[in-house]
């Protein structure tokens, strides 16, 4: 079974590094998200053992505020890859529709430019449709988990679709830079920023319709607030821009060609991110007091840590194999990475069952455990998703949510009339001159007002 080919054969080779990186990234996301579910029933501050404290120290250095920027970079990479493929295939389709193309006529420069422009518009519309559907999926997911990230990525796709399709990197860099400065200023001013968490009511929780409805409504409001925060004053947009730019290089498609650079970025990024978060992490395991800028350092330099993770994971995955096969952990991670939305949403389902549904039905209270034990639960949830993906892989199936998104995007496309290519402009032609006939094409005689049309070639009636 080929492991690097996409589910739709027309898309061609699918390089392993992005998929392997997504697969391991989802483990980091599970570890980063599980504290949002692991809440004490009465809302009190949970006791922290020494094991929990040192685990949170390690998690802050290498996981927290690194997983989601990594996710955003891979999302931007995927969007630009989709755009590139759509423009390439669409350009050929439009060129094939030109008169004489079937007979081997070479397109003129203005026709080639027209075909590429039409394909670019199609790619822009595709990204926007995908973004709107992701926003809807994110809203539904946010009713259960207001820290959802799918909606934020969908909104980024909608807002940046035109700039991405036209590869306007100057505007993209400017947008990412402005948001980075705004984010840093916000972190320094506030000292803390909530990433969204599940709601826990005070006192004993009971399974009642009123509580359930209040929980859903509150989650929806939190999701809307978190959505704006994630897009405007988090580092999702800068990370997505970096990922989109990477799609126009071979750093991820052929990492074997860039060993020295990727090793430098990988180790340097992880070390820089860890150093920036070190003091803040130390406060979780010792009696060291928190500095006002600790959160800003951890969050802002989390992007450096995410770049480090991506570089090392790309090196580990390597380039495409001659036989298209992956083995071992690469095979497992790739199977998960190619079904990233399904795995991400499945994690929410499993966390909800483990920490909420079953304990509430059995004891009437949410489940709570130590942070280190919760991390083991996150690992177990990720492994369960790995098994699911391997079963889908064996059957040759995409993830159900990937299929749902792909189907929704395809069926929501509106058919629009294709404008004809602009008339040719030949060298030496002056404004107002009639177009010069192309070789082998009979030009039409101009019709003057009040004159009958010129007779057409062919048999004439007898006098």
Stretches with model-predicted labels:
Residues 2-426, 437, 461-463:
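Alpha-helical transmembrane segments and their immediate juxtamembrane cytosolic regions
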Residues 424-428, 432-440, 444-446, 450-462:
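Intrinsically disordered, low-complexity tandem-repeat regions
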């Amino acid at each position: 079974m080929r492991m690097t080919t996409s589910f739709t054969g027309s898309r061609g080779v699918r390089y392993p590094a992005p998929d392997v990186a997504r697969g391991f990234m989802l483990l980091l996301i599970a570890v980063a998200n599980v504290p949002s579910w692991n809440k004490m029933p009465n809302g009190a501050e949970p006791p922290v053992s020494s094991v929990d404290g040192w685990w949170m120290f390690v998690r802050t250095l290498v996981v927290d505020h690194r997983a989601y920027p990594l996710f955003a970079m891979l999302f931007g990479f995927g969007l630009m890859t989709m755009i590139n493929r759509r423009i390439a295939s669409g350009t050929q389709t439009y060129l094939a529709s030109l008169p004489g193309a079937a007979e081997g006529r070479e397109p003129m420069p203005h026709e080639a430019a027209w075909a590429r422009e039409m394909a670019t518009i199609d790619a822009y519309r595709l990204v926007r449709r995908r973004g709107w559907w992701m926003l809807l999926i994110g809203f539904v997911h946010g009713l259960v988990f207001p820290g959802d990230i799918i909606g934020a990525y969908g909104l980024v796709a909608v807002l940046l679709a035109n700039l991405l399709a036209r590869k306007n990197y100057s505007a993209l860099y400017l947008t990412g830079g402005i948001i980075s400065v705004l984010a840093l200023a916000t972190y320094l001013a506030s000292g803390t920023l909530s990433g969204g968490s599940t709601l826990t009511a005070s006192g004993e929780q009971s399974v009642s319709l009123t509580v359930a409805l209040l929980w859903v409504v509150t989650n929806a409001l939190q999701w809307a607030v978190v959505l704006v925060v994630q897009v405007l004053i988090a580092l999702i947009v800068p990370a997505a821009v970096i990922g989109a730019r990477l799609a126009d290089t071979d750093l991820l498609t052929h990492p074997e060609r860039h060993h020295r650079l990727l090793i430098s970025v990988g180790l340097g990024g992880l070390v820089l991110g860890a150093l920036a978060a070190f003091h803040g992490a130390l406060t979780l395991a010792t009696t060291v007091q928190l500095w006002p800028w600790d959160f800003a350092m951890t969050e802002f330099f989390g992007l450096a840590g995410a770049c480090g993770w991506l570089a090392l994971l790309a090196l580990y995955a390597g380039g495409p194999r001659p036989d298209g096969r992956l083995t071992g952990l690469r095979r497992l991670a790739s199977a998960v990475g190619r079904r990233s939305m399904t795995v991400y949403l499945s994690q929410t389902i499993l966390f909800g069952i483990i920490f909420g549904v079953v304990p509430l039905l059995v004891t009437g209270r949410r489940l709570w455990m130590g942070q280190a034990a919760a991390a083991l639960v996150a690992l177990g949830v990720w492994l369960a998703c790995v098994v699911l993906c391997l079963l889908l892989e064996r059957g040759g199936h995409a993830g159900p949510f990937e299929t749902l998104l792909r189907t929704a995007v395809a069926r929501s496309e509106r058919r629009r009339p294709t404008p004809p290519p602009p008339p040719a402009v030949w060298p030496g032609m002056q404004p107002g001159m009639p177009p010069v006939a192309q070789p082998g094409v009979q030009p039409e005689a101009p019709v003057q007002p009040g004159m009958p049309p010129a007779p057409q070639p062919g048999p004439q009636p007898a006098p």
